[in-house]
Amino acid sequence: IRTRIEFINSFFAKDEIDEIWITFPDPQLKKNRVKKRLTGAEFLTMYSKFLSPEGTVNLKTDSQHLHLYTREVIKVNELRELVANNNIYATTSEVPSEVTALKTTYEARYLAEGKPITYLKFQLKQDFTYLSPDFAADDEL
């Protein structure tokens, strides 16, 4: 589906999706754009309306900031974190094989630049209104 993310709820019914993959999104590193992060409270609230009860969200990124922010979102909302890895190519034992099996164009570029690629896998609560964390690192933006 190619659409604006704000319209995603109109494409899926309740419990229709088992897994969401967010690969190399814009980390929205400007202070006034924090609400645009695809792993932020507003978007997780949207995803929770169509993700199945055992469904998962996967985040693969080169942005340490986004990785740490998303871990704070998980913590403040008391979500179940299934996998958290700061460098998937340095410690592959705890990373599912499908995470490293395919490399996006961005991933290949970031690896060539020596940037570590991070990965998170977590479960959402259904029909839940998510909270935004008080993420101190955002104050430095």
What residue spans do the PLM features occupy?
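Conserved class I S-adenosyl-L-methionine
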Residues: 29-34, 56-77
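SAM/dcSAM-binding transferase cores
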Residues: 78-141
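S-adenosyl-L-methionine
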Residues: 1-22
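Compact, Lys/Arg-rich rRNA/RNP-binding cores from ribosome-related proteins
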Residues: 20, 39-40, 63
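Conserved Class I S-adenosyl-L-methionine
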Residues: 42-48, 68-91
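A short glycine-rich, Lys/Arg-flanked "PGG" loop and its adjoining helix->strand segment in the class I
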Residues: 37-56
